[in-house]
Amino acid sequence: MNNKTISISFDVQQLYYLPQYLPVYHRLLKQNAGHATFVFYHGIHDAFIKNIIQSENLDHIWVKDKAEANKYYKNQKVDWIFFGNTFPFLNEIPQISKSVQLGHGVGPKASYYTKSSTPTTVRFVEGEYRTNRLKNMYPNDNFVNVGFCKLDPIINGETTGFDLNQLGLKTEKKTLIYAPTFYPSSIERFPKNFPESFSTYNILIKPHYFSTSKDKYKKQRQLLSHWSNYDNVYLAKVDDYSLVPFMATADLLISDASSAIIEFAALDKPVIWCNFLKLRWNYRGIFSYRFKKRMDKDYNEYSNIAVRADSYQELKTIVAEQVANPHALSKTRLQYAEKLAGTFDGNASARIIDYLLNNK
C-alpha cells in the first residue's frame, strides 16, 4: 500500500481551468493522498468564484497578480504546482517545487503545442498522438500521456447534468448545446432570431469565458443576451463555469473548432462544426495566413469528428439529420476523439495522482 502523500497548489489564472483541475483534486482526496490549495486571482468575477469555493469546499488563497502568486509559491514550497498555461516566473519554480502543466482543453489552436516552449517538470498530455508530437518538438522535456481528466466525472457517473425543468426547459424536447469559442467565433454569424429556427429543441448556450468577460467581445454579449430571452434557451451564467454538466445533459453539440467538439465526440454524441466564422479584417483575404498560423494542422481533423456546416443556412437540416441518426458516425467519431484526446476510461485523474506520488 502506498502511504506517500503530496502537497499541491493549483494556479487558477482563469476560472475555466477549474474543470480540468477539480477531477485531479477529487482523486487526491479520494485516495487520501495529500492536500491541495487553489490560488485564485482577483478579477471581475470574485463573487462568483467565492460561491464555487464554498460549494467545492476548497482550501484557497487570493492573489492580485502573478508576481504575488510567485511569492506565495516561494514561501509555501509545496511538492507540485499545477499551471494551466505559461507562467512568467517558471524558471524560479524548480528551486522550490516541481511544476505541472495541465492544459484546459484539446482544441486546434497552435498555442496548444507552443505553450510548452517554457518547460515544466512534467506536462500531462491527452493521448499518444499529441504526446509524440510534443516529444518531437521539445525532445529534452518530459511529457506523460494520461488521457483527458476533464471527462472523468461524466465517464464515472459522478456528473448527472442539469434538471431541465429547473432551467425552464421542456423534458420532452431534444436538447442542443451551442458552445462557441471567443475567436474566431461563429456567434456573430448567427441571426438574432436563431432560437426561433430551433424552437422544437431546448438550447443550452455555453459561450467561452472571454466572450462574457472581455470588452472587445461586447457584440457577442449583446447577441447572447438577446437569445437568452427565448423560452427554449438557457444561457450559461458566470458560475456555470464548466462545460461538463452541459455535455452530460445535451443530445447534440454545435460549436466552432474548439476543444468542446472533441470532448463531446468522446461521449459518442453527434457534433456539428460551424465552419462559418466572423474573422477580423486582418485575418481575411491577403491576411488569411494569420488565421492558418493561429490554427494547428489538427484543425483539419475536425471534419472527421463532426459534421461540417459551411453556412448558417445549412445548420437546421444537419441538426435534424444528426438528431434522427445519432450513431451514424459513431465509429469514426470515437476513433478520432481518441486520437486527439487519448483514452476515455475515467482514470486519467488517477494516473496523474499516481505519477505525482511516484515522482515526488
Regions found by a protein language model. Name each.
Residues I81-F83, L90-Q101, D239-F287:
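A donor-sugar binding/catalytic signature common to diverse glycosyltransferases
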Residues F344-K360:
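C-terminal alpha-helical cap of glycosyltransferases
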Residues N145, S259-Q335, L340:
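Catalytic binding pocket for nucleotide-activated donors in carbohydrate/polymer assembly enzymes
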Residues S9-E158:
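Active-site and donor-binding regions of nucleotide-sugar-utilizing enzymes
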Residues H60-D65, Y234-V238, N304-L315:
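Short acidic-hydrophobic, aromatic-tinged amphipathic segments that line or gate anion-handling sites
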Residues K170-M247:
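Donor-nucleotide binding loops and adjacent catalytic segments primarily
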Residues P119-E188, T212-S213, A328-Q335:
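A nucleotide-sugar donor-handling region in carbohydrate enzymes
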Residues N2-I8, I96-S97, K170-K174, T200:
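A short, charged/proline- and glycine-enriched loop
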